[in-house]
Amino acid sequence: MTAPASSPASPYDPLDIAVELIRCPSVTPDEGGALGVLEKWLAPLGFKCERMRFSAEGTPDVDNLYARLGSGHPHFCFAGHTDVVPVGQADAWSVDPFAADIKDGRLYGRGAADMKSAVASFVAAAERISREGFQGSISLLITGDEEGPSINGTRKMLEKLAARNETIDHCIVGEPTSVEKLGDMIKVGRRGSINGWLTVQGTQGHVAYPHLADNPVPRLLEMLRRLDAHVLDEGTDHFQPSNLEVTTVDIGNTATNVIPGSARATVNIRFNDLHTGASLDKWMRGVLDAVTAEMGGSYSFKTSVSGEAFITEPGAFSALIAEAAKEVTGITPELSTTGGTSDARFIRAYAPVVEIGLPNATMHKADENTGVSEIRQLADIYETVLRGYFAGRAS
């Protein structure tokens, strides 16, 4: 298959769409008009656009968009988000974060890399395919809650689709997976992530009278030492070794002559598919119990799993995407599971999912930007994937 030529003169130039999206101040959880921009571009192509708004106690309400063209199978879905992280320190920017300035062949603005430009690229690719016709369905699953708690977005959209027996066959997520050059890395899985909050109880007292107090700090330090020293695994064929990091230690004591009454710490484990959140919770509690049995005292501990490890086994679907990237860019992408979590962790329970998007060097930074040519090339990659997919090359 020959890679399609970039089409900047097309009425669906992805740059135009990206500029419109970046000009929407959609700092999570605010929609900022971005979903309306997408509806404006998608509806004329025949996409049925459906707003999905979800709520949950203690979290902000979130607007999301599900747009589908066609009703049959195979059903190819693009998942992404239009919410962005806050600007941060405004004077660190050399441009207006929401002006979508173009300088020296690069598009600047919050969301340029993560990931409004990728959303724009897929819309442009879908327009090209829709003009020629295809057998099956194309959809976009766009959330406004990826950069936030991730409670009222992709996960609930997928649950709603499943409740009405609407299935997705394969999915691409447009996260910025590339490292140095467009197409040099795609994600075929992600590590899991579990946070743990530990509080060791003691008895506050004067440092001159330690026999009248109970210092929790030595017990906390021993617990953290044992957790940190343990080698969880050596990695697998597709994953790095699992890793625990102590992320905070807080005694809450500013006085030098007071033994604290409690000591707290948090830990995070990024883990591969040799573990689950439940198995790691059990292991950590075992370590804490052992220290408590030896040193006395008491503790409280809670955990939260933001995502389990998963892998989309290399096969026809990942090969289709890798080949499309190579055809357009000339680069053979690395199939990787590195990095943080993404909404692919929710999608993997419903369909095979692979992530491919723009270079990620400037995401979440001041002066976030991406190359104009890269936006158009990414549209070419997505178009090549869609052509191959509906030609049956994913199975």
Swiss-Prot record:
Catalytic activities: N-succinyl-(2S,6S)-2,6-diaminopimelate + H2O = (2S,6S)-2,6-diaminopimelate + succinate
Subunit description: Homodimer.
UniProt name for this protein: Succinyl-diaminopimelate desuccinylase
Biological classification of the source: Bacteria, Pseudomonadati, Pseudomonadota, Alphaproteobacteria, Hyphomicrobiales
Family membership: Belongs to the peptidase M20A family. DapE subfamily.
Keywords: Amino-acid biosynthesis, Cobalt, Diaminopimelate biosynthesis, Hydrolase, Lysine biosynthesis, Metal-binding, Zinc
Cofactor list: Zn(2+); Co(2+)
EC nos: 3.5.1.18
Source species of the chain: Parvibaculum lavamentivorans (strain DS-1 / DSM 13023 / NCIMB 13966)
Known function: Catalyzes the hydrolysis of N-succinyl-L,L-diaminopimelic acid (SDAP), forming succinate and LL-2,6-diaminopimelate (DAP), an intermediate involved in the bacterial biosynthesis of lysine and meso-diaminopimelic acid, an essential component of bacterial cell walls.
PANTHER family linked to this entry: ACETYLORNITHINE DEACETYLASE, N-ACETYL-L-CITRULLINE DEACETYLASE
Gene Ontology terms, MF aspect: acetylornithine deacetylase activity; cobalt ion binding; succinyl-diaminopimelate desuccinylase activity; zinc ion binding
Entry annotated with the keyword Amino-acid biosynthesis: yes
Pfam families: M20_dimer, Peptidase_M20
Cited Gene3D superfamilies: Zn peptidases
InterPro entries linked: ArgE/DapE_CS, Bact_exopeptidase_dim_dom, DapE_proteobac, Peptidase_M20, Peptidase_M20_dimer, Peptidase_M20A
Binding annotation for Zn(2+) 2: 114, 147, 364
Domain of life: Bacteria
Catalytic EC class: hydrolase
GO annotation, biological process: diaminopimelate biosynthetic process; L-arginine biosynthetic process; lysine biosynthetic process via diaminopimelate
CC cofactor note: Binds 2 Zn(2+) or Co(2+) ions per subunit.
Residue numbers annotated as active site: 83, 146
Keyword Hydrolase attributed: yes
